[in-house]
């Protein structure tokens, strides 16, 4: 009933405003009472027309379909425009029926109505805020004091929502902004207190509990710098996601999330050439191996955005394929998807799949990737990473697949691990396949991805949750990192750029010290490193390097048209000799013998297996 009465009440109020404004305009325009009386009689005869015209125009301008508690400049423009149009319409009708009043009366009426109607809406907004404050007055005696970093549009919208819905939980003390012209000024009734350099002092002076970073369009490097400043305080850190993460482009408190390690990387979102990517994926049947894995599942999601005809999700583990299928059914219910449980080493099965579905694009993400684990079973690494790639690549060529993209790793460069060496051989095989096939074969090489299964971040989080210690193999160990979506998007972009035979190298930015990463994660979890949570150095594991390389120094890279993608200059190999060596190594089962054969195939492979003897 309330939802029917409220609009009716607003219409009645507007009617009163229209009549009052018309009468006021008469007495403002004419000082002579006799003249005023004459036009007053004419006005009274026109009041039904004036009221009807104004209400219809207000309805057309949706003045009765707005939530006035959020009223701003857009609503003010609508009120002004509606009253101008209403005045012109009323004047036109008056001329038509030959009862026109002086033109100044229409102008005065419109001007007064802007004040009356605008004032009534402002009253609704103030009243709504007052009621909301009254509701929360006694809910919480202790409110979290908040600093908002970013006195821009996002910060203003966030403050309005905090004042509207979270007034009993958070109290915004002020804004932080690097624009010094804003300092000392007020935005949405809240003062801009200083720049990022003042955060630590202000947090201490005002006893701030939480710092919210509300700068969704700012580059990742700047966000990283601000986070590092905020980490010096004891405040809880939350952040609005980047613009590319906000689906509707609106700002909401519900979108606030804790600052995570990904934010500390300071990496900017990838700029895809969507036209080029869509050109080779749109309307195509796309097969993805390892589709249930961290990278494979994200490639599935990114490909789905490009409107393929059909997605073939190939994986050995039924649970992971089931999970990605469930996600895709929710996100893309109309897209054709086929879950396929298969081992990439099973040539007969893979051939049957490609023969039946006839994929045009293949992303080969299936692989054994855990470095220490593969040191203990090198023969299994060879069969999965080398034989699996050989089977998929040869079958793709046989069925004339248009584009074949293999996911590789920085560990393939001057490898010290079995896993890295097997991936280097897989790269070599894919390159050779390109020379004797109509299929465009390419490999894409990148470093560690944050949050992938078995990676260091999930391990650290588990260790922190258990109270520590957090284990780091070496205090000086460094790794390249990027986020899973970033890696997957660049893989798609590399596929669009492929001419055939390239080994693409992704720009991983600067390497990150794992020890620093552990400290940051402990701090972000609300603990003090080596006080609340111990960091324990355990020593290098089998096959590990202190530093990873994305390309060998003697070979170098070439630039491409994309700033984050390069082409590695890699020496050619003899296909027949490589085929023979692969056949030979597949016959070997004893670990040390497999390693010796790997060294023969990849002379730059320097095994680091001392830890196996301990």
Residue ranges and their predicted role:
Residues 9-10, 19, 23, 34, ...:
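A solvent-exposed beta-alpha-beta segment
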Residues 203, 207-209, 308-309, 354-363, ...:
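Proline-aspartate-enriched helix->loop->beta-strand connector
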Residues 271, 276-280, 428, 432-448, ...:
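Strand-loop microenvironment adjacent to phosphate/nucleotide-handling motifs in alpha/beta enzyme folds
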